[in-house]
Amino acid sequence: MSAYADTSFLVSLYVLDGNSARAAARMKSVALPLSLSPLGEVEIANAFQLRLFRKELDRSQIKAAQKLFREDLANGIIVLRPLPPAAFDVARRLAEKHTRRLGTRSLDVLHVACALVLRATTFYTFDEKQRKLAKAEGLRVP
């Protein structure tokens, strides 16, 4: 079994928020490593900086979160997988098939497309629209 994690799930592992306890609990049963696309890596960096901008965290908390994330990458808990070119074709198909019904955003369909192209069987997210899309495409969403 392989797993793909989106930004909402991963950020909750590194920054205390309303989903942190759920993320930590789910990590106990995750089949490692978690796959992450370069898109997710950019989103995580941006999410950390948004917390600073919104004054939800200070610089030292951001640095600590970044350090933990880098350690998980270095230790193979999270593996950065190249964004396959086919992901864009799959994302376009997902948008045409599901967006009118689910209201998914571009990045939602791209994350799910990445998971599908990378042959993930499980998709970790706290985003409700991504959850519905991933389930509609046959991914397991705990």
Q: Residue ranges of each PLM-predicted region?
A:
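Active-site-proximal, substrate-binding regions of enzyme catalytic domains
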Residues: 39, 45-94
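A generic local structural motif
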Residues: 20-22, 67, 109-112
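Short, well-structured N-terminal submotif of metal-dependent ribonuclease cores
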Residues: 1-43, 47, 51-64, 137-140
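A local structural micro-motif
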Residues: 35, 81, 123, 140-142
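Active-site neighborhoods of divalent-metal-dependent phosphate/nucleic-acid chemistry enzymes
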Residues: 77-128, 132
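Generic secondary-structure boundary/loop-capping signal
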Residues: 7, 11, 36, 75-80, ...
